[in-house]
From Swiss-Prot:
GO terms for biological process: neuropeptide signaling pathway. Probable neuropeptide. The keyword Signal applies. Keywords: Disulfide bond, Neuropeptide, Signal. Disulfide bonds join 29-68, 33-64, 40-56, 47-53. Residues 1-20 form the signal peptide. It comes from the Eukaryota. The keyword Disulfide bond applies. This is Protein Aeq5-like1.
Length: 88
């Protein structure tokens, strides 16, 4: 009985750790996008008034954010595939 409880506790810890790691990677990816888009602001002193700055941010941030989304989607698909293999 103790071994069953130990396995359940370990499973919960691993699930929580995996979720936290995923969240950290997601946050790191988004922060990288934000940092890259800030370069637009540093290159344009009138950033908040400038259409070119807004265009720069959209051209940098949107594709970067989409890459983060794709990374997350692929990771989730891989986990589902691995979980399916474990069941069979």
């Amino acid at each position: 009985m103790k071994s069953v409880i130990a396995v359940l506790v370990l499973s919960l810890v691993l699930v929580n750790f995996t979720q936290a790691a995923k969240d950290d990677r997601w946050k790191a990816c988004r922060m990288k996008c934000y940092t890259e888009s800030k370069l637009c602001m540093n290159n344009d002193s009138k950033c908040f008034d400038s259409q070119s700055c807004n265009s720069c941010i959209q051209q940098v941030y949107s594709p970067c954010f989409n890459r983060c989304q794709e990374m997350l989607r692929r990771r989730e698909a891989f986990k589902r595939m691995f979980a399916f293999d474990e069941e069979n």
